[in-house]
A protein has these predicted regions:
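Conserved GNAT-fold acetyl-CoA-binding loop/helix
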Residues: 34, 38-63
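Conserved beta-strand in the GNAT
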Residues: 72, 78-87, 104, 109
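Conserved beta-strand-loop-alpha-helix junction that forms the acyl-donor binding cleft
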Residues: 140-151, 167-171
Length: 183
């Protein structure tokens, strides 16, 4: 896609306005956040990957936010990205996420027309900063193993495979990725 004059969502990274990264606020719409997740994960859903964010309800979005810290990227007062960091993720399915000192990153999404423009890198950097500020020595996340473009993107940002997990109800195996956090 080509950037139309003044259209930040046309497919090119914004040049005049940079998205603001901030904490999710009580004034932010959970329905809008959920719709952003649906748009961002639609390509993955079309590949047959049943990520939770493909079709989760606003209630599920709200539940997933519980116990975590959510950052959003906004552009012209519109939500264009999000990331959720948990101090530790309580699960019986992935031992790595329960390790002391590991902050877990979930629900990471960027407006499709802005992907590749640095919004995701800024969100991820902010989540990692939060983890360092709160005494965590590593960040971890997972993604579908068949989503090789995502695995490669995270590898470029310093994340390496540390294991695998088969989440209940998912049609794919996830690769668990970890990154040491340097102060």
């Amino acid at each position: 896609m080509h950037r139309r004059n003044g259209d930040a969502l046309s497919g090119a990274a914004p040049t005049l306005a940079e998205p603001a990264i901030r904490l999710l606020s009580p004034a932010d719409s959970i329905a809008d956040l959920t719709t952003l997740l649906h748009r961002a994960y639609a390509r993955l859903g079309a590949l047959g990957l049943n990520y939770t964010a493909v079709d989760q309800s606003p209630e599920v979005t709200r539940q997933r936010l519980g116990g975590g810290t959510c950052y959003v990227a906004t552009l012209a007062d519109r939500l264009v990205g999000t990331i959720l960091v948990h101090p530790t993720y309580a699960t019986n399915d992935c031992e790595y996420f329960t390790r002391p000192g590991v902050a877990c990153i979930h629900q990471f999404a960027v407006e499709p027309g802005l992907q590749g423009g640095g919004v995701g890198r800024k969100l991820l950097a902010r989540a990692e900063q939060w983890a360092r500020e709160h005494g965590f020595h590593e960040a971890a996340m997972d993604t579908a193993e068949p989503a090789t473009h995502l695995v490669e993107f995270y590898a470029r940002l310093g994340y390496g495979a540390v294991g695998h997990v088969q989440w209940p109800g998912k049609v794919y195996r996830s690769v668990v990725l970890g990154k040491p956090l340097v102060a």
